[in-house]
């Protein structure tokens, strides 16, 4: 068995210590705010299988840094809007925590849904299929 310098769980813990985490009930109340953009970073198959938060924008985890960087040929204009609050989510909150920590390192302000889509659904958040 290999020995890692830092485990994935430790990386998530470190990320969570430096990022803004939003609880499900709070994001439910923010859904209708036009200044809030919910970004789903799950794999497209997860979205198709489990559904998605209405109005969320899908951005695959592997492309986030490139879609946000205005100098990247892959840049998406949705990430260039001033005054918007971007809230990222995945299934459990691990990938989105790491994503938001990386984006903060890039100078991009964002938050993440603390417990992810699985808790969103359990706590009564609306889901589209």
Labelled PLM ranges:
Residues 39:
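Active-site flanking residues adjacent to catalytic metal/cofactor-binding acidic residues
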Residues 1-36, 44-85, 94-129:
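Rhodanese-like catalytic fold shared by cysteine-dependent sulfurtransferases
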